From Swiss-Prot:
Dimer of alpha and beta chains. A typical microtubule is a hollow water-filled tube with an outer diameter of 25 nm and an inner diameter of 15 nM. Alpha-beta heterodimers associate head-to-tail to form protofilaments running lengthwise along the microtubule wall with the beta-tubulin subunit facing the microtubule plus end conferring a structural polarity. Microtubules usually have 13 protofilaments but different protofilament numbers can be found in some organisms and specialized cells. Tubulin is the major constituent of microtubules, a cylinder consisting of laterally associated linear protofilaments composed of alpha- and beta-tubulin heterodimers. Microtubules grow by the addition of GTP-tubulin dimers to the microtubule end, where a stabilizing cap forms. Below the cap, tubulin dimers are in GDP-bound state, owing to GTPase activity of alpha-tubulin. One of its GO terms (cellular component) is microtubule. GTP binds at Q11, E69, S138, G142, T143, G144, N204, N226. It is found in: Cytoplasm, Cytoskeleton. Residues 432-447 have a biased composition (Acidic residues). The gene is TUB1. SUPFAM superfamilies: Tubulin C-terminal domain-like (SSF55307), Tubulin nucleotide-binding domain-like (SSF52490). This is Tubulin beta chain. SMART domains: Tubulin, Tubulin_C.
Length: 447
């Protein structure tokens, strides 16, 4: 079967990862110690994508947990699903990276990386037919960003033909955890552009907004945010974990979603999002799901797709949904909003169906979009980076670990290139001869 090996690095990565395993264990009928209590054969059929069956009917996640300090690991171990993971798969250092990308990528992280790769190799050897890797991390810190990208490039070297998907928490515009976030993020994106096949961008602020605006939570905790992320991760991987009519795997997703190799940064969304109290008062319909899914307020990254155009997007519907209704709704969305889709990729919306809904819902949908408006996010980080780098603020922390200023300049220009590539495809039209301007685009849609 097509297995996926999961890595989680750094504090953020481990917390999101833990939430993800909790969600999918529930969907597959596993309790906190990995014993199967489910009712449906469908839960077992493709269990081995993410789980390894050990002796005495215990299922063990194919997960590698990495951090440069023991704190977060202990928290995961003490959590409700701490007994699920294989004890040898916890790899941690003692020093911490202190939010310093260079420590994670070049010094502390580099010392630990071989240990991690041994565990990854062992997990990969336990697979019949390894499909690829997924990694959860944040781009603003030291371990997840620095060491996470180091792991990605090492795994790339060793498994060049396997898919690499990353769930990356990008720095948010207003909520900043650390001052050097723009440095860490720019250096990380520099790596991801080259080494990842698909990157799902998630951002804390957008998650906060969803919690406050849609879920009506007054002061959302990180637990609530991680719960949202795990819902999306569960949705994106649905087709791999359950038999569906329209199946999709990491490679198919990439083939359908990435028109140009560098442009593989996706926005994700999830529907239905309703406040906890309102669940029982409304039935969810396919049109509602579709509408909510394409709503900018539902996107988990702070960029508004109305400022750009979709190159491609894909929607995963779960539950008892009629194929025809889904097709009609998706066509409807494309016709009504044709100005938001590039016209030089004719069938750029792809749908996949799976008959098993998430726990507690009749149906749900997950949205993955490759929109040129994601450049807002990179622009924002780039501007902050430039402001600090021009004054060489905080640079000594990085050069002290052996980094060169040249690397910063390279990362900066790579990110600027990425932004202008997105912009170029946003403005491109079918007939390249006549320049088409954005001001005219909305009018065409209304005629």
């Amino acid at each position: 079967m097509r297995e996926i090996v999961h890595l989680q690095t750094g504090q953020c990565g481990n917390q999101i990862g833990a939430a993800f395993w909790q969600t999918i264990s529930g969907e597959h009928g596993l309790d906190g110690s990995g014993v199967y209590n489910g009712t449906s054969d469908l839960q077992l059929e493709r269990m081995n994508v993410y789980f390894n069956e050990a002796s005495n009917n215990k299922f063990v996640p194919r997960a590698v947990l990495v951090d440069l300090e023991p704190g977060t690991m202990d928290a995961v171990r003490a959590g409700p699903f701490g007994q699920l993971f294989r004890p040898d798969n916890f790899v941690f250092g003692q020093s911490g990276a202190g939010n310093n990308w260079a420590k994670g990528h070049y010094t502390e992280g580099a010392e630990l990386v071989d240990q991690v790769l041994d565990v990854v190799r062992r997990e990969a050897e336990g697979c019949d037919c390894l499909q690829g890797f997924q990694i959860t991390h944040s781009l603003g810190g030291g371990t997840g960003a620095g060491m996470g990208t180091l792991l990605i490039s090492k795994i790339r070297e060793e498994f060049p033909d396997r898919m690499m998907a990353t769930y990356s928490v990008v720095p948010s515009p207003k909520v900043s955890d650390t001052v050097v976030e723009p440095y860490n993020a720019t250096l990380s994106i520099h790596q991801l552009v080259e080494n990842s096949d698909e990157t799902f961008c998630i951002d804390n602020e957008a998650l906060y907004d969803i919690c406050m605006r849609t879920l009506k939570l007054n002061n959302p905790s990180y637990g609530d945010l991680n719960h949202l992320v795990s819902a999306v991760m569960s949705g994106v991987t649905t087709c791999l974990r359950f038999p569906g009519q329209l199946n999709s795997d990491l490679r198919k997703l990439a083939v359908n979603m990435v028109p140009f190799p560098r442009l593989h940064f996706f926005m994700v969304g999830f529907a239905p999002l309703t406040s906890r109290g309102a669940h029982s008062f409304r039935a969810v319909t396919v049109p509602e799901l579709t509408q909510q899914m394409f709503d900018p307020k539902n996107m988990m990254a702070a960029s508004d797709f109305r400022n750009g155009r979709y190159l491609t997007c894909s929607a995963y519907f779960r539950g008892k949904v009629s194929m025809k209704e889904v097709e009609d709704q998706m066509r409807n969305v494309q016709n009504k909003n044709s100005s938001y889709f590039v016209e030089w990729i004719p069938n750029n919306v792809q749908t996949a169906l799976c008959s098993i809904p998430p726990r507690g819902l009749k149906m749900s949908s997950t949205f993955v979009g490759n929109s040129t408006s994601i450049q807002e996010l990179f622009k924002r980080v780039g501007d902050q980076f430039t402001a600090m780098f021009r004054r060489k603020a905080f640079l000594h922390w990085y050069t002290g670990e052996g980094m060169d200023e040249m690397e910063f300049t390279e990362a900066e220009s790579n990110m600027n290139d990425l932004v202008s590539e997105y912009q170029q495809y946003q403005e491109a039209s079918v007939s390249e001869g006549e320049e088409e301007y954005d001001e005219e685009a909305p009018l065409e849609a209304e005629e």
